[in-house]
């Protein structure tokens, strides 16, 4: 997964003094929870893509704790951060289509896309299926 333009700018502006770290209250750098979202089309550094429909499908973004105490994310190593716990979506109540991309947001709906990327293998999600990322499947890279 790659960081979006929003996140790259936020990090650079914070590192180089444009943003005061204590004033980041509403930014992704100060969120206790991040949200994993699934897409049926390509995402980009500026956002976009078709997120799986929430209408009658039982789809919702999955909340993932964003702190050191819950161990949901591994420590970054060589510019790579991975999920340290499985991320499991609810059983689909109707077809979600073919999931091709994933993104991380700072809100349960809307919000800012933090990181995004294509799946190594797309997956058609039919009614009754459960979509899951195993430990280490999500890798966010800063390079």
Show the residue positions of the predicted features:
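Small cysteine-rich, disulfide-bonded extracellular modules of the LU/uPAR three-finger superfamily
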Residues: 1-102, 106-143
